[in-house]
């Protein structure tokens, strides 16, 4: 039986080993992307001086809006519990665009964008640097190759476990040692065998979750195992697009109204009492109730990690183990700021949780910094396994030929 599994292990590993190395290594680099970015770009992510209180939300966002082209609008804001961290302001376009803003001065600190190095690593990890054809036509070869390699990695890991399985307790103890004093060949052998066993659970978790991004059929089957039906992306996209169009129409109307009222305000400013604060921010601003919403949620959730607000919706996330994308969700009336619906995470359907769990397990942040470090080490071992395997295989071939 083990002889069959040895052949499976070898002949699945040889053609795809280098790809697995690239995918695992790039994945390891991405584990601490946020920390590295914040270390090198602290001026972008953090404010220079923490003051007693930030600017009112409507005034802050209106100030940001004046720096944007007419075709771009503010769609949301994310506020950290850390008073020294800059607000992240979401924009209508391009997709997922956002700015970091000093909430105490209104200064736009810069764009939120992936560095060239980490974008390179991400494209390597997901698509082997390939790009999808315009119009999504044809086969996305990079994505396909990564998916097939990841699927085969699952069988390689399982076959490796069968080959490794010791018969005695003494053999188990010896098979989990890595010896560095008996020559390079013994070291690479121990690293391949023992290192593979130490990383096995994490590598399997990363592979099984990662496949949900590669193959729709696998994603459907994976979801069904947990009793969840895959939501139709097309319907979701249409609904989101419709909501976005409504929001942009409302914001465009606000911009036009503000533009038309500029001359009137200029004429009235000289007659307005000095203590009258009823300017363009107080009534016409689409952000007029956002500060009130934030204050309510902050009082209700003193241990929050981040509060995000957009037109008619808000969410609160926490520093907890488990699904790192978990959040309590709220809907509110944009005309009076009253909450209309509350959806606490614990009461949400499985369909609203599983994607966050998949991501959290895949990147290893479900257990905080400890599991992230273990995931990083496991991914590096995953990158080393094919290389040590090639070394041992070539050594064996040379020995046989002699």
Residue ranges of predicted features:
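Conserved histidines in hydrophobic membrane contexts and catalytic metal-binding motifs
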Residues: 1-402
């Amino acid at each position: 039986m083990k002889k069959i599994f040895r052949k499976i292990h070898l002949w699945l590993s040889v053609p795809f080993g280098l790809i697995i190395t690239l995918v695992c290594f790039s994945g390891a680099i991405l584990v601490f992307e946020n920390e590295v970015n914040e270390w090198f770009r602290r001026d972008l992510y953090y404010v220079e001086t923490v003051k007693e209180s930030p600017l009112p939300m409507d005034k802050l966002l209106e100030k940001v809006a004046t720096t944007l082209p007419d075709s771009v609008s503010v769609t949301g804001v994310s506020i950290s519990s850390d008073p020294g961290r800059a607000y992240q302001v979401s924009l209508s376009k391009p997709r997922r665009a956002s700015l970091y803003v000093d909430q105490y001065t209104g200064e736009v600190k810069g764009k939120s964008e992936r560095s060239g190095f980490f974008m390179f690593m991400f494209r390597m990890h997901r698509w082997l640097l390939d790009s999808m054809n315009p119009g999504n036509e044809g086969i996305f070869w990079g994505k396909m190759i990564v998916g097939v390699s990841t699927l085969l990695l699952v069988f390689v890991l399982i076959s490796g476990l069968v080959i490794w399985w010791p018969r005695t307790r003494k053999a188990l103890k010896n098979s989990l040692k890595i010896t560095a004093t008996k020559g390079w060949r013994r070291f690479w052998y121990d690293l391949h065998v023992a290192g593979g066993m130490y990383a096995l659970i994490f590598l399997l978790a990363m592979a099984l979750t990662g496949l949900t991004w590669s193959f729709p059929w696998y994603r459907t089957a994976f979801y069904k195992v947990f009793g969840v039906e895959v939501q139709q992306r097309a319907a979701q996209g249409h609904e989101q697009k419709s909501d976005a169009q409504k929001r942009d129409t409302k914001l465009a109307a606000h911009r036009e109204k503000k533009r038309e009222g500029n001359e009137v305000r200029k004429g009235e400013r000289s007659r307005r009492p000095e203590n009258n604060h009823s300017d363009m921010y107080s009534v016409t601003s689409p952000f007029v109730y956002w500060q009130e919403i934030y204050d309510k949620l902050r009082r209700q959730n003193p241990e929050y990690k981040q509060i995000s607000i957009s037109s008619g919706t808000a969410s609160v996330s926490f520093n907890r183990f488990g699904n790192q994308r978990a959040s309590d969700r709220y809907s509110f009336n944009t005309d009076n700021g009253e909450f209309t619906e509350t959806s606490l995470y614990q009461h949400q359907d499985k369909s609203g949780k599983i994607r966050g769990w998949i991501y959290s397990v895949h990147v290893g942040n479900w257990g905080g910094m400890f599991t992230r470090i273990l995931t990083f080490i496991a991914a590096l071992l995953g990158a080393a396994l094919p290389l040590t395997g090639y070394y041992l295989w070539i050594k064996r071939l040379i020995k046989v030929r002699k």
